[in-house]
Amino acid sequence: MGRQTTRLTLDNLEQLPGGCDACVCWELDPVRRAQVRGHEAEEKAGWVSTVLRQWGSCGRVVCVDDEPVGHVLFAPGVFLPGTERFATAPASQDAVVLATGYVAPEHRLGGLGRLLVQGMAKDLIRHGGVNAVEAFGAIHPRPGECILPVDFLLAVGFKTHRPHPSYPRMRMDLRTAITWREEVEVAVNKLLGVVGKRREPVPDHRATRRPL
């Protein structure tokens, strides 16, 4: 079973599972959401287009056997007015916000969420100028709520940055992701037999031996 992540684009936006292609609870404030009711999919596409054009990568999609089964959405806080509803807002100025994510139920508990977060971190490291990722997590997640569970965020490397009884603000330093990448590269090299196979020349002590 092949699985891989790719960047969120207008071409794969409509393929997102769970109706996420028409959810704008993070992208618009409550007043604007009421004004565009019935046209959420168009607004979501417009939002993705704007962020891609003005800032860069804003999401990752995970595919299993070429079928999209999950995604994460992220952007600087200025593009996510929906964060203003949280008591722990706003996000730090040096951070990008991981707004939400979704994995189809039949594919959960298989590490796809972690794969998505790692793909996001890779995009942000390449983008540059971002020190961390922050997210508003739910301590007691409710069905249909587009807020990532705190337990998931803790499991993929986030720490509590600003406590709250219901929706704390979590943070992951991108240096953590860089360290993870370095560890993976070492592991891969070991598997390929690169590490440990380079032998230093054995010095010939006879050539440098001095008479007693």
Identify the function of each model-found stretch.
Residues M1-G38:
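Conserved N-terminal entry element of GNAT/NAT acetyltransferase domains
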Residues G38, T50-S57, C63-T100:
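Conserved acyl-donor/pantetheine-binding loop and adjacent beta-alpha core of acyl/acetyltransferases
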Residues E40-G46:
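Short Pro/Gly-enriched beta-strand edge/turn motifs at strand-loop
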Residues G77-F79, E106, H140, A177:
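Short coil/turn motifs at secondary-structure junctions
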Residues V103, L109-I125:
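Conserved acetyl-CoA-binding loop-helix of GNAT-fold acetyltransferases
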Residues V117, L124-G144:
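Conserved GNAT acetyl-CoA-binding A-motif
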Residues C146, H164-H205, R210-L212:
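C-terminal "cap" of GNAT-fold acetyltransferases
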Residues P149-P163:
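Conserved acetyl-CoA-binding loop of GNAT-fold acetyltransferases
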